[in-house]
């Protein structure tokens, strides 16, 4: 079968590898769709992550497909089911798992980051990580359940109040998901800052009340222009250091700043502690998707969340190395690899 195999920084190869054998509690999935995530970009760029990605690993952790084989102990799905995958396999017995914060599991296995993932034609997955969905939902939509689950965890931590004001910095896929979730949480005003015009237009279509071009408009002035007196929640989804610093500056009194965008491990920001003290700002961060995957999938299936509009385009597996190597292409929008 064809697979995208990572070897080292800037070295991802499309190769023929054997179809994996499954154990008693695993399923074999014919992968149909796998999204390119920011984590994939960081791995390709050689950045250190939460766990090292071994040479020879097949990347891809946002994927869906069809079950073609099941182990004898599998009870949750059947051959022919359409499924998507939660890529974070927890051990269940470390202190973090037993303490109810399993996303910090000391023995976590990352499908597509530490073991083979979805950028391959066939993938073996433990039954505990597989979620069936109706065949009326496209494989591309279902592959978006993983990033939605991550966003749900972040929004849960923001404590967005009904009638409040939310500012989202960054209008890529994550920012556009956050925009919709903030609206569903009851925010009366959601502002979104994004330099690319097409993404601002899409943000307005998805419900943004205020859109801001940060290259040509002053963020604080634009908010004042729309009579925004206090921003209660700021969600930084761009992963840029300057955006995190700006989030702290524009945050209102007694507000929450969610640092959601992924930065490089060795990057630092300049923060004025007095500003945080004076405004009683709460700084928060969000790590992967503990216990939110089912909710994410249900929101996609119910149509409460539009995940199709933010897909920039689909591509073949053979195009993947070129997309990862092209920073301009990477920034254009969300890619889904079809297999």
Annotate the PLM regions.
Residues 7, 18-19, 54-60, 111-115:
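Short Gly/Pro-enriched turn/cap motifs at secondary-structure boundaries
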Residues 20-34, 48-95, 134-136:
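Glycine-rich beta-strand-centered segment in the early N-terminal region that forms part
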Residues 91-169:
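NAD(P)H dinucleotide-binding glycine-rich loop of Rossmann-like/cofactor-binding domains
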Residues 137-216, 221:
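Mid-domain Rossmann-like dinucleotide-binding core that forms the NAD(H)/NADP(H) cofactor-binding site
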Residues 158, 201, 205-280:
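Glycine-rich cofactor phosphate-binding loops and adjacent beta1-alpha1 units
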Residues 195-196, 263, 289:
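Residues in the short beta-alpha loop(s) of Rossmann-like NAD(P)-binding domains
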Residues 241, 245-249, 290-339:
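C-terminal hydrophobic helical "lid"/dimerization subdomain
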